[in-house]
């Protein structure tokens, strides 16, 4: 039978942390106060921060907004390409083309192919595709470039961004 009490009675008390030499007090840290902190510098977090600042500016409200991003820089961990529908960007920045948004390549023809087991394919007519699969007016983009651009726009509005 295991004798737990006897096992613990053998602890070398000289190895136990000396409480007089240990201070539980943490060093004082710098504090920064913001009205809004957005966690995540992806498209959604940056868009939220931008919209809040735009609304505050339009209503003459002093609102401090901060974005905290885990990556070393904005867009550093967003590696995907994207078929981007610019409707939300039109609402955020109606003049996004003049501002140099990195939306350069318009989506071309839509084609949906059914691949069968023998390796051949059959094209499905576009008229049979749901509207969500039509890419007219959309762009082929690097999401990382768009995020970096959104970060620049946010900083111009006064959003503070802390990567890393």
Stretches with model-predicted labels:
Residues 1-32:
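N-terminal mitochondrial targeting presequence
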């Amino acid at each position: 039978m295991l004798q737990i009490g006897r096992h613990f009675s053998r602890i070398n008390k000289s190895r136990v942390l000396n409480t007089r030499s240990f201070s539980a007090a943490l060093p004082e840290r710098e504090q920064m106060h913001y009205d809004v902190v957005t966690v995540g510098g992806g498209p959604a977090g940056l868009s939220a921060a931008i919209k809040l600042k735009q609304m505050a500016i339009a209503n003459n409200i002093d609102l401090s907004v901060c974005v905290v991003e885990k990556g070393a820089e904005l867009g550093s961990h967003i590696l995907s390409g994207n078929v981007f529908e610019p409707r939300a960007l039109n609402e955020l920045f109606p003049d996004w083309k003049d501002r140099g948004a990195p939306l350069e390549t318009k989506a071309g023809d839509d084609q949906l192919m059914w691949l069968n087991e023998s390796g051949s394919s059959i094209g499905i007519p576009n008229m049979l595709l749901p509207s969500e699969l039509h890419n007219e007016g959309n762009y082929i983009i690097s999401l990382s470039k768009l995020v970096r651009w959104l970060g620049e726009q946010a900083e111009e509005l006064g959003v503070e961004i802390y990567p890393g």
